[in-house]
């Protein structure tokens, strides 16, 4: 097999992304058509959304480089049987156009808030994966009344929540490394302007390489019940994960005090990408927690 990427410091992070892209094509995708879809003008850009089903609103926030279909295609058919599912594609992702607007978690969370305003959704349960989980944390901190229950899948509220090799993975990467990749094919399939590909990747790599920290004190102030789902080998620093759970009121002894309202689930033998592919497991956790 021809070696496309050279250098040990480059190969591992590229493989991480390649696996992430691969899941897009492994997914059967949702078989449903959205009951509603469109663009919301918010904070100077137009954010794409899709709505499925009826019931209590449930907002889904995808991971970096992902789309609604690629991230949530296996879950939406089941979730939308009992919930009004609102899936959003963030700046530059999927159907949402690229913008040279500064990309940061606070702005992305504000975009989600704007979409909820547009759809007249006062509050909702929110589920975020990876980058989407960080956005969900930010939304909960800045607009706590928006979030009834929060589900965080393989994500963190600070850079040091990742193991060092993950936190530094994107710093040496360049847009040209993604040429002719499955990610490029997925982008070309739905992006409003395919010529923005290189700018999008460059923007995302800069965003992912930027350190962030929403503050332990802000996490401790979250009053919404939180479910954290992590793969045991998903790249999250498990010491920091335990601290996060303690900040949310967990990690004690429920034999001696009431069970905390926030929960932690560590799925065995799963990576960052792999845990998201465990649709049945995730649906089971969501069903129990979101009731």
What are these regions (language model features)?
Residues 203-218:
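Active-site nucleophile elbow and catalytic-triad environment of alpha/beta-hydrolase enzymes
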Residues 260-291:
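Catalytic active-site module of serine/aspartate enzymes centered on a nucleophile-bearing elbow/loop
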Residues 222, 228-230:
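Short beta-strand/loop motif that positions the catalytic acidic residue
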Residues 235-243, 275:
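Conserved alpha/beta-hydrolase "acid-adjacent" motif
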């Amino acid at each position: 097999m021809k070696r496309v990427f050279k250098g040990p410091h480059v190969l591992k992070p590229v493989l991480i992304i390649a696996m992430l892209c691969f899941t897009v094509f492994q997914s059967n995708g949702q078989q449903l058509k959205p009951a509603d879809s469109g663009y919301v003008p918010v904070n100077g850009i137009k954010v794409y959304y899709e709505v499925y089903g009826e019931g209590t609103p449930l907002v889904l926030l995808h991971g970096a480089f992902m789309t609604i279909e690629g991230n949530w295609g296996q879950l939406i058919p089941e979730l939308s049987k009992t919930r009004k599912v609102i899936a959003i594609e963030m700046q530059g992702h999927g159907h949402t156009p690229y913008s040279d607007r500064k990309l940061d978690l606070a702005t992305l969370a504000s975009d989600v808030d704007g979409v909820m305003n547009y759809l007249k959704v006062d509050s909702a349960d929110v589920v975020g994966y990876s980058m989407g989980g960080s956005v969900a944390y930010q939304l909960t901190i800045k607009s706590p009344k928006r979030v009834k229950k929060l589900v965080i899948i393989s994500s963190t509220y600070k850079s040091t929540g990742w193991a060092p090799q993950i936190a530094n993975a994107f710093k040496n990467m360049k847009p040209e490394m993604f040429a002719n990749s499955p990610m490029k094919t997925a982008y070309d399939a739905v992006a409003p302007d395919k010529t923005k590909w290189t700018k999008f990747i460059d923007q995302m790599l800069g965003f992912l390489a930027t350190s962030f920290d929403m503050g332990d004190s802000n996490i401790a102030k979250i009053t919404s019940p939180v479910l954290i789902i992590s793969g045991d080998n998903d790249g999250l620093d498990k010491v920091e994960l335990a601290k996060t759970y303690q900040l949310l009121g967990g990690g004690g002894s429920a034999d001696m005090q009431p069970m905390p309202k926030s929960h932690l689930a560590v799925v065995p033998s799963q990576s960052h990408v792999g845990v998201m592919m465990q649709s049945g497991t995730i649906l089971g956790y969501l069903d129990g927690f979101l009731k």
